[in-house]
Amino acid sequence: MTEKFIISLTKKSERRLDKLILENCPPNLSLSRTKIQDLIKQKMIFDPQKQNALTLKTKTDDLMQVILYSDQYLQRTLMPEDLDVPIVFEDNALIVFNKPSNMVVHPVKSAQRGTLVNFLIYKFQDTLPITYDRFRPGIVHRLDKDTSGLIIVAKTKLSASSLIKQFKSRKIKKVYLALCIGNPLENLNKIIGKRGINMLEDNILEAKTNIRRNKINREMMEVCANNGRLAISRFTVQAVYDLGKNQKLSLVSCEIETGRTHQIRVHAKLIECPIVGDNLYKLRRKEDVDVKKTISPLLDGKRSRQMLHAHELSINHPESGKTLFFRGILPYDFSNLLSNLGKFKTS
């Protein structure tokens, strides 16, 4: 398959998108219905009028053409995409979003579409400054795919430079909310002796360790003694939920001084209170399995994801120097779960 094909939908006997494309597909493409379905799922088939990726549920009545793109094309081209990303603040220098979960910040090999950058290209075209590479226009920091919450995008070169410096010099205050399995304040006898864990004033639990990529599973990060990068997280318990049968959850706020990959998730596991829904950094304990079963009905059928939300950000404005404070509203899945847990709250 070459990089780009335009298919005119002249035959309209089939209305479902995959069948309609198959019926109108030129023989030289040699596309099966299964392959077409895969392309749709990978967001590689578009409406040329709206420049939106199509889905199997797309209404085809008024659809006249579709465009098929290859992997090679998408890897070299940032495609605009109109997505629902709530804006918290915007001026001439920067824009702050409340990123949904299940959204990658910038295109990677496994996610070419549906990223925040695809939306930035749709909204700003090519006006944003290039920061680290051309696939990250305006991006000065990032969040994991399944982490929701506040993310800042620079709109000018001056703003990008200032914000990147603030992140590197640790001048930006970042506070997350996480729903964790267990209560770290009840584990102090077990965890305080571990390397890098200390109890500070006001019941703040600090994890100060080096972190590096796991040599066996490259998707994971791990605490290490040497050769890693310093990561500092401070946990404060905000609420405790007693589910019975030795099952507890805690809502914790976590202020991070550094911004390492998976930092909070790694440190939550280190203090033996992994984040609910985090399958990468879970502990293999019976109580963790039991908690997962107990809260499953409280999710209202929603997909379980790591309950981690970038809740607060405080920065110095790149132009005025004025301190700006932002708070990101909890998404429905997180707030609804907390609401359903309310009857179990003990503190």
PLM features: residue spans?
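RNA pseudouridine synthases
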Residues: 2-347
